A protein has these predicted regions:
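N-terminal auxiliary "cap/dimerization" subdomain that precedes the catalytic jelly-roll/cupin core
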Residues: 2-98, 108-116
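Glycine-rich, charged/polar anion/phosphate-binding loops
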Residues: 39, 140-143, 213-216
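Short helix/loop capping segments that flank catalytic or ligand/cofactor-binding pockets
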Residues: 63-65, 165-167, 201, 208-209
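Extracellular-facing segments of soluble proteins and assemblies that are Gly/Ser/Thr-biased and enriched
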Residues: 92-139, 147
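Active-site environment of non-heme Fe oxygenases that use a 2-His-1-carboxylate facial triad
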Residues: 114, 134-136, 156-168, 217, ...
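Catalytic core of non-heme Fe(II) oxygenases with the double-stranded beta-helix
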Residues: 139-196
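Catalytic core of Fe(II)/2-oxoglutarate
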Residues: 183-235
């Protein structure tokens, strides 16, 4: 049985009071982001005041190599699975996932890693059904800052640039989706590293209405792509 509930010390540092005086910045509200170097930090997303759990991990070299090799082939990839996990001991059936790339170095390690993430996600939430999507993207799928209308979503980028997000107060939530309202100061835009694992709490998490994590897809540079995996709680 997987467990993510070992003690965690949040790494966030309070923002200076002068930060609130920046033009266009609205006052902070009672939400924070939990960031750490072990998977246990992901469990902090269960706390009411947390809308992001971010595990700042470094991918094993063979898994990182797999992602880079896959992207180098310049082939399309868009796969979805609905995975049933009837009990805590059930293992996700990832047979066939990215099977067209199974001859690449690191494929088995990638599958093992994805399987662990599914199991950990299900264990943390008590989920019996998990939706998995694996995609190669050459452009920003959701280029404007927005919130997800789901309870919680796991996202990790195996190769390429990672997702971007905002701390509370960096943008007026009433203007989400409007390009003119997005932060102009690049220091206000946070970037998730390749290989890191994030849990984004959305608007449909009980008690989190109006506080879903604000984020967007990054725009890859011309000729660049990204390999991204997402998990959703289906039941």
């Amino acid at each position: 049985m997987l467990t993510l509930n070992s003690p965690v010390t949040p790494l966030d540092k309070p923002l200076p009071a002068s930060w609130l005086l920046l033009p266009g910045v609205v006052p902070l509200v009672s939400r924070r982001q939990a960031i750490g170097s072990t998977p246990a930090v992901l469990a902090e997303v269960l706390q009411d005041e947390v809308n992001l759990g971010l595990w700042q991990r470094r991918l094993p070299a063979h898994i990182a190599d797999f992602g880079e090799l896959l992207l180098s082939l310049n082939q399309p990839l868009a796969e979805s699975l609905a995975l049933d996990l009837p009990d805590e001991e059930a293992l996700p059936n990832l047979q066939g996932l990215a099977s067209g790339f199974s001859d690449l170095h690191g494929y088995d390690g990638f599958i093992a890693d994805a399987s662990w993430l599914v199991s950990a996600f299900a264990c943390l939430l008590g989920a019996k059904r998990v939706g998995l999507r694996l995609r190669v993207l050459d452009k920003a799928m959701c280029p404007r800052f927005h919130v997800d209308h789901v309870p919680v979503r796991l996202i990790t980028t195996y190769a390429g640039i990672g997702s971007q997000w905002l701390r509370e107060g960096a943008m007026d939530r009433r203007q989400l989706g409007q390009a003119s309202a997005e932060p102009r100061d690049p220091t206000l835009i946070q970037q998730i590293g390749s290989g890191e694992v994030a849990l984004f709490k959305g608007e449909k998490w009980h008690g989190n209405q109006g506080f879903g994590l604000i984020h967007r897809s990054p725009q890859p540079a011309p000729g660049e792509r990204r390999l991204i995996l997402t998990l959703d709680w289906l039941g």
